[in-house]
Every structure is written in structure tokens, then in C-alpha cells.
Amino acid sequence: MKKQYRLRKNWEFDLVLKNKKFIANKYVIVYYKKASAFKVGITVPKKFANSVGRNYHKRQMKAIVHKMNLYNYPYEMVIIIRKNFINCNFLTKVIEIEKIFTQFKQQNEKIK
């Protein structure tokens, strides 16, 4: 995933989180807000793993989002990874993230 599609600054994350719109399952929480372009930020709490482990799971999540090709959706998103995400295999992660994003797409088509 290219840098132009990432949320980087703390205040960017705060703006999305303050919007309070989210979708959750037992693996991730996805906060979102309407924006002019697609951007995503990924967080893993410190207590789940050391820095190497946290970066590993962030890379996996970036790969899943890149594979799903969500770049034409005008939303900013913050994805918070839960403990269950860390303990499952990659195939389960892909399936569960695809489910949550199809749920997100259906929910936002109703709004339009």
C-alpha cells in the first residue's frame, strides 16, 4: 500500500475516531468517516506483541487491504486490531476482513 493511502499523523487518527462510526467483529474494529480520498491507518495495541510482532500484523493488514482494492472508496479508516487477529492464521484473517468490508460496503450503499 502506497504512503498516499495511509493516515500518518496522530490528529488524522483522532479526527476519524471522533466521528464514532464503526463496524466491529472479533478480529478488528474499523472506524470510518467520509472524506475526499481513501486513506487507512492501522493500529495494534502495545500489550499484544513486541514492536516486531506489531509491525508484522500491520504488514499483513496492509496486504489484505491492498488485495481488496478499496482505493476508490472516499473514506478515511482507522483499523484497530484485536487480540484474536494476532492468534489466527492468515487465511482466516483474509476471510474475516473481507466479510467486514462487504458489510461496510452494504451499510454505506444504504446511506447513498
From Swiss-Prot:
It comes from Mycoplasmopsis synoviae (strain 53) (Mycoplasma synoviae). It comes from the Bacteria. It is an enzyme of class 3 (hydrolase). This is Ribonuclease P protein component. Signal peptide: none annotated. It catalyses: Endonucleolytic cleavage of RNA, removing 5'-extranucleotides from tRNA precursor. One of its GO terms (molecular function) is tRNA binding. Its EC number is 3.1.26.5. Disulfide bonds: none annotated. NCBIfam families: rnpA. SUPFAM superfamilies: Ribosomal protein S5 domain 2-like (SSF54211). InterPro entries: Ribosomal_Su5_D2-typ_SF (IPR020568), Ribsml_uS5_D2-typ_fold_subgr (IPR014721), RNase_P (IPR000100). GO terms for biological process: tRNA 5'-leader removal. RNaseP catalyzes the removal of the 5'-leader sequence from pre-tRNA to produce the mature 5'-terminus. It can also cleave other RNA substrates such as 4.5S RNA. The protein component plays an auxiliary but essential role in vivo by binding to the 5'-leader sequence and broadening the substrate specificity of the ribozyme.
